[in-house]
Regions:
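Histidine-dependent nucleotide/RNA phosphoesterase domain, centered on the 2H-phosphoesterase fold
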Residues: 1-190
Length: 190
């Protein structure tokens, strides 16, 4: 790593089986919303915190926070529930997949504590928007008005969240490339 700031983010990862299920939802919706830029299977994750520009020393600090904090969190079941849109169905820019209440609360709590640890270490975190647990399925360049019933709504699917990763995000003309800087397993539930 050189001294240039890097784009990076912390995210919960999914198992290959869960990614395959999520990708099947994307495939069923691509023809229903062809103007959207759909997420590739290898980029499926839940972003807990995005950092637009961290210096290498800050990257190392974040790695240490992740190594010290996330192994204390127990792996947890998470049910993928419904499809939604940001900012609204009338002005959709992001199509997302939401979670059951319990796992959403675990994600919110983990993000809050992680952000507090970063702040204590002098690392600025984005607090302009409250954390809303979701998995991005697609992005739209221009907002569109769509009805929820226009999209394939999946049946509920339960998986386990077992690890967190810290990714570098490199922007390219073909889309972002995510490179894991560190991956840490959550505490295994016995």
């Amino acid at each position: 790593m050189n001294d240039n700031p890097i784009r990076c983010f912390v995210a919960f990862d999914f198992s290959p089986e869960a990614k395959a299920f999520i990708h099947s939802i994307i495939e069923k919706n691509q023809t229903r919303l062809p103007q959207a830029r759909w997420v590739q299977p290898n980029q499926i994750h839940v972003t807990l915190q995005f950092f637009a520009a961290l210096l290498p020393t800050q990257v190392n600090q974040v790695k240490l926070i992740i190594q010290n904090f996330f192994p204390l969190i127990e792996s947890f079941p998470s049910t993928l529930a419904e499809i939604g849109a940001f900012s609204s169905w009338n002005r959709a820019r992001v199509i997302w997949l939401g979670f059951d209440h319990r796992s959403g609360e675990i994600m919110k709590q983990a993000t809050q504590v992680f952000n507090e640890e970063c702040t204590k270490q002098g690392i600025a975190v984005d607090r302009t928007r409250p954390f809303s647990p979701h998995l991005t399925l697609a992005r739209l360049k221009n907002p569109v008005s769509i009805l929820p019933q226009q999209l394939f709504q999946p049946t509920c699917y339960t998986t386990s969240i077992r690890q967190v990763s810290f990714y570098q995000s490199t922007l390219t003309p073909r889309g972002p490339i995510y490179s894991p800087l560190i991956t840490i397993p959550l505490k295994e539930v016995k």
